[in-house]
A protein has these predicted regions:
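Short, compact, well-ordered microdomains
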Residues: 67-107
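Generic, low-specificity signal for short hydrophobic/alpha-helical stretches with a mild N-terminal bias
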Residues: 12, 57-60, 74-78
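Intrinsic disorder/low-complexity detector
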Residues: 11-15, 38, 107
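Short, solvent-exposed coil/turn segments at beta-strand boundaries
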Residues: 20-26, 75
Length: 107
């Protein structure tokens, strides 16, 4: 079951949006700066795995500079984090598309 949710990182002043896979790991992640609503991350596990398996460190570095770094590890306990709430698939897709456009990539 795919779960989509958001939390708030008080230290970084970021809204974090996750689409978690069946194992509870981030499949896609969007980070939006709270102060100005600017997207700063829009990373995808499938893209990261593809680069890891078929490209070099330079390509991976370029991806991370453009789209940010995907969270590693299970996202257990997100429900107790600040600002935690489930988000709809539609809301996540809207945020994903907006973030990818802002960061210069395909939706």
């Amino acid at each position: 079951v795919t779960v989509r949710f958001r939390t708030y990182d008080e230290d970084e002043d970021l809204w974090l949006y996750f689409e978690a896979d069946d194992e509870g790991w981030a499949a896609r992640q969007v980070e939006i700066r709270a102060a100005d609503s600017r997207p700063v991350t829009a990373a995808c596990l499938a893209e990261v795995v593809h680069l890891r398996d078929h490209a070099d460190l330079t390509a991976m570095g370029g991806y991370e500079r453009r789209y940010g770094v995907l969270a590693e590890g299970p996202l257990d306990g997100w429900e107790t984090r600040p600002g935690a709430a489930e988000v709809s698939a539609e809301e996540f897709e809207r945020l994903w598309a907006r973030a990818r456009r802002a960061l210069g990539g395909p939706d």
